[in-house]
Amino acid sequence: MAVKIRLKRLGKIRAPYYRIVVADSRAKRDGRVIEEIGKYHPTEEPSFIEVQSERAQYWLSVGAQPTEQVEALLKLTGDWGRFKGDKDAVSTVRTREAKPAYVADEKKKPVLKPKTEKAAPEAAAPEAEATEEQA
């Protein structure tokens, strides 16, 4: 069985995102897969690329052939270099900057009240079970 590492297309028209999958080469593009090993969202800025490195290394070592696009993604993440023997291969994937945490304005009064836990009914429940067992 010839195994390929390729992209499985998901999403809407003109808004694609992909899963990096291991599948039989004869299977349909979006058909049955052996394993999902990553994600690729090309429409985000910068593109979101996530690959489970251990699983990619395993499948490459047992002979799975990556498609051209997946090979390019593996080169960006450094997995292709590690597979070819470069121990110093590093990921060159750019990541999005973290959003600053939201800080509520202390001058304004909060609209929503925080929930309070009702501890009293929960404490009464074990006592009720104990009285039923004695009866």
Swiss-Prot record:
Residues 105-120 have a biased composition (Basic and acidic residues). PROSITE patterns: RIBOSOMAL_S16. One of its GO terms (cellular component) is small ribosomal subunit. Pfam families: Ribosomal_S16. One of its GO terms (molecular function) is structural constituent of ribosome. Residues 105-135 are annotated as: Disordered. SUPFAM superfamilies: Ribosomal protein S16. It comes from the Bacteria. Keywords: Ribonucleoprotein, Ribosomal protein. The keyword Ribosomal protein applies. InterPro entries: Ribosomal_bS16, Ribosomal_bS16_CS, Ribosomal_bS16_dom_sf. One of its GO terms (biological process) is translation. HAMAP family: Ribosomal_bS16. PANTHER family: 30S RIBOSOMAL PROTEIN S16, SMALL RIBOSOMAL SUBUNIT PROTEIN BS16M. NCBIfam families: PRK14520.1, S16. Belongs to the bacterial ribosomal protein bS16 family. This is Small ribosomal subunit protein bS16. It comes from Clavibacter sepedonicus.
